[in-house]
């Protein structure tokens, strides 16, 4: 591979930008839509067990978010370094980046598996008031679910890294296959393992977790296969996974801010659960349902985001200013359009969305208000997400971190806390649009600085 120094330029530097962005993003958007559908269907089946089971899965969300943050953030660092190295024709460095990414995921998996074994019950007990009559049931459900998800988390973590490698080299079609197959397997296995269909044992919430990890492991296996057989830009081998400090440092210069940025979401969900729990466990369940529903809107935008990062990074390495600007403009237009559709759906039929999860009258009362208020920030979020992906592609991980901290920690939790104590439960949801207005304003300021510092100077 390395002897091909005269190879044809990657399509990310030559294909028309609109066509390239659609080509790069559509497979990931489609696969993430399937992934979002799985998230929704999974929770629908869990809600049929009981509202306590649904609450338990909602309370597990912060740790699952943290796990995704570590895998996704490291993947962002690998993606940016790999794409930039390919754009600069530094093929040996690109190869090393891919192998270090795989090694880092193996190490991260061990840490989460250990927490799954020893820390799961304590994590749920920290969120549930022991005096509640259903506290033991929620903790039991949650511990069973989270232990399985973490002990077998090597599937999702390695899958995410391998998919980032495929994305960075323009092989996005294969990421659609891996994510799609994994999600479909999960959806098929959910009712079978939860309710004991087709001769399978009735596992309840443990069945939901088992279906999840089986789907993830199958997706990981496909991602390994595609990287070995279809990806000629990099070569994965255990012999090449000897730690390389400079490469790991380059990965985490972008990756650690991205990890922290996504982990902030974990802190936010944990904090919101603590703010909502004194009102009722139903309010916590509503918050969890909102995140499942919003994934169907946000996941396609994240798929678009994953397509944008390697395109901008590659063209930054190749010093192609106009292609970078076209990518950003077109990305924002698509993102805001998707978010507008999502906002309209949430405003029009919140009750029908909630009834998918077997919502009780109390859940409907709380949830209809929550969905209609929260969705008002969707279009603003669409702009912020694209700007954050731009910062990441330029290696400006700190800028992404600052924006994420503003929208998911610095503003939203204090706002939610104050609104809860002054105005009550229904006012809490206004913290989302308040935080988004602040973060988008700050994002615009940072982007103007980035433009004058890096983009404007390109040929």
Task: Tell what function each PLM region has.
Residues 1-25, 82-154, 201-256, 312-377, ...:
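Short alpha-helical transmembrane segments in multi-pass integral membrane proteins
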Residues 33, 37-55, 124-136, 192-203, ...:
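Helix-terminus/linker motif at the lipid-water interface of multi-pass membrane proteins
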Residues 66-69, 186-191, 220-224, 296-299, ...:
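Hydrophobic transmembrane alpha-helices of multi-pass small-molecule transporters
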Residues 23-42, 148, 182, 215-219, ...:
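Transmembrane helical elements of multi-pass membrane transporters/channels
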Residues 54-114, 156-175, 286-344, 348, ...:
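Small-residue-rich hydrophobic transmembrane alpha-helices
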Residues 75, 149-167, 175-183, 208-221, ...:
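Short runs within selected transmembrane alpha-helices of multi-pass transporters and secretion channels
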Residues 30, 42-46, 57, 82, ...:
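Hydrophobic/aromatic residues within transmembrane alpha-helices of membrane transport systems
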Residues 23, 46-65, 136-141, 205-206, ...:
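Interfacial/gating helices of multi-pass transporter permease domains
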């Amino acid at each position: 591979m390395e002897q091909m120094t005269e190879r044809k330029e990657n399509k990310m530097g030559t294909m028309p930008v609109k066509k390239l962005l659609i080509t790069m993003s559509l497979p990931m958007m489609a696969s993430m839509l399937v992934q979002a559908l799985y998230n929704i269907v999974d929770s629908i089946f869990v809600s049929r067990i009981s509202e306590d089971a649904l609450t338990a899965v909602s309370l597990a969300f912060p740790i699952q978010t943290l796990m995704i943050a570590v895998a996704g953030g490291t993947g962002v660092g690998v993606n940016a370094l790999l794409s930039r190295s390919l754009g600069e024709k530094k093929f040996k460095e690109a190869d090393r980046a891919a192998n270090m990414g795989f090694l880092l995921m193996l190490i991260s998996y061990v840490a989460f598996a250990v927490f799954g074994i020893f820390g799961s019950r304590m994590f749920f007990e920290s969120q549930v008031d022991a005096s509640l009559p259903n506290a033991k049931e929620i903790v039991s459900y949650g511990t069973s679910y989270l232990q399985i998800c973490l002990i077998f988390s090597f599937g999702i973590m390695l899958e995410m890294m391998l998919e980032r490698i495929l994305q960075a080299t323009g092989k996005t079609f294969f990421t659609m296959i891996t994510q799609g197959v994994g999600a479909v397997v999960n959806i098929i296995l959910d009712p079978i393992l939860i309710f004991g269909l087709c001769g399978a044992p009735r596992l309840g919430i443990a069945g939901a977790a088992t279906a999840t990890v089986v789907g993830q492991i199958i997706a990981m296996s496909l991602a390994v296969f595609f990287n070995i057989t279809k990806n000629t830009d990099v070569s994965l081998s255990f012999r090449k996974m000897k730690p390389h400090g400079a490469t790991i440092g380059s990965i985490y210069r972008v990756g650690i801010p991205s990890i922290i940025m996504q982990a902030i979401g974990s802190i936010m969900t944990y904090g919101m659960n603590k703010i909502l729990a004194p009102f009722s466990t139903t309010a916590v369940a509503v918050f969890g349902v909102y995140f499942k529903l919003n994934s169907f809107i946000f996941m396609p935008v994240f798929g678009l985001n994953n397509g944008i990062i390697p395109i901008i990074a590659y063209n930054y390495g190749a010093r192609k200013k106009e292609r970078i600007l076209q990518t950003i403009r077109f990305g924002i237009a698509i993102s805001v359009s998707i978010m507008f559709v999502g906002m309209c759906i949430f405003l029009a039929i919140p009750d029908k969305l909630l009834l998918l999860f077997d919502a009780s009258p109390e859940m409907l009362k709380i949830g209809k208000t929550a969905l209609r208020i929260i969705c008002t920030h969707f279009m603003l979020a669409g702009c912020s997400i694209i700007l954050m992906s731009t910062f990441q592609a330029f290696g400006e991980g700190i800028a992404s971190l600052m924006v994420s901290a503003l929208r998911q920690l610095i503003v939203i939790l204090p706002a939610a806390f104050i609104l809860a104590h002054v105005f009550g439960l229904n006012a809490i949801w206004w913290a989302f649009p308040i935080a988004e207005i602040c973060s988008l304003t700050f994002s615009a300021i940072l982007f103007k600085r980035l433009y004058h510092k890096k983009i404007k100077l390109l040929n």
